[in-house]
Amino acid sequence: MADLLTIEEAQRLILERVRPLPSERVPLDEAAGRVVAEDARAVVDLPPFPSSAMDGFAVRSHDTPGRLPVAARIAAGRPAPRELRPGEAMAIATGGVVPDGADAVIPLEYVVDHDNSVEISEPIAPAAHVRRRGGDLRAGDTVVARGVALGPAQLGALAAAGVAELACGTRPRASVVTTGTELRPPGEQLGPGEVYEANGLILAT
């Protein structure tokens, strides 16, 4: 019997002959399972604006503790109506735009909401519960590096960073060849000592 190659020798011979595949632009919603060919970079800062990490009230931290009038209510997806003035608060939803002038958000659990005013019994630290603009990523930062296979986590991060399409390697074409004199395809009559070939289907699936 001819000498068999070791696994290391087989890997070396294969890698010596491998050539990188060309890349193509792929829409993000068709990129699952593809391999990134160039670093994919954020289109926008993430978050793209200072946002609230909690449902609560945007305040100036030095105005706490105390009872503050509620000047406005900020829903997610809507801009703040104006700058927050000294001595007032604005109700804010998780993900809402923190108004200029505010430097903290105090969660609902820690206040007494009187509809038109809010009672805050403890001081809150500057920057508490505020996600600063670009705190996760800045525009131009690498979101997914070259060579990474795209799964749900990577696709979600790319979508959040505003990436609509990206360069991916073209899909490789491969053939599976199974050998053995004892092998027969399913559906044929087995002879003495023969078995049905199953590994090819497993590898190709």
Regions found by a protein language model. Give the residues of each.
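Short, glycine/charged-enriched hinge/interface segments at domain edges or termini
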Residues: A2, L13, A40, A58-T205
